[in-house]
């Protein structure tokens, strides 16, 4: 399977509820690299790179609501080409 990278923006109640940390846990469990970071508008930006099927699983997890404490309203995503090598999944 081919390697892909996506960038996603997750909207709803996703800050202050452990969203980035549980996203990091899920991404690492799936063998992905990238990051999750809070944005000023209250959303979370997620970059995920890895095997296409594993990236799709993370996207399904995000769209299904992520952690129990979060309330995801919508997820937007598009292909992404990071400027540097991502060697781990980090919180930014």
UniProtKB/Swiss-Prot annotation:
Belongs to the acylphosphatase family. Keywords: Disulfide bond, Hydrolase. One of its GO terms (biological process) is response to heat. One of its GO terms (molecular function) is acylphosphatase activity. It catalyses: an acyl phosphate + H2O = a carboxylate + phosphate + H(+). Has a considerably reduced catalytic efficiency compared to other mesophilic acylphosphatases. Shows a considerable resistance against urea denaturation since the full enzymatic activity is maintained in the presence of urea concentrations approaching 6.0 M and that only a slight decreae of 10-15 % was observed with higher urea concentrations. This is Acylphosphatase. The keyword Disulfide bond applies. Disulfide bonds join 5-49.
């Amino acid at each position: 399977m081919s390697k892909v990278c996506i960038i996603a923006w997750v909207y709803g109640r996703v800050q202050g509820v452990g969203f980035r940390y549980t996203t990091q846990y899920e991404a690492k469990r799936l063998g992905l690299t990238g990051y999750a970071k809070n944005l000023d508008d209250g959303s979370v930006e997620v970059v995920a790179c890895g095997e296409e099927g594993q990236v799709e699983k993370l996207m399904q997890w995000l769209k299904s609501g992520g952690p129990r404490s979060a309330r995801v309203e919508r997820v937007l995503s598009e292909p992404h080409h990071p400027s540097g090598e991502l060697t781990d999944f980090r919180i930014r």
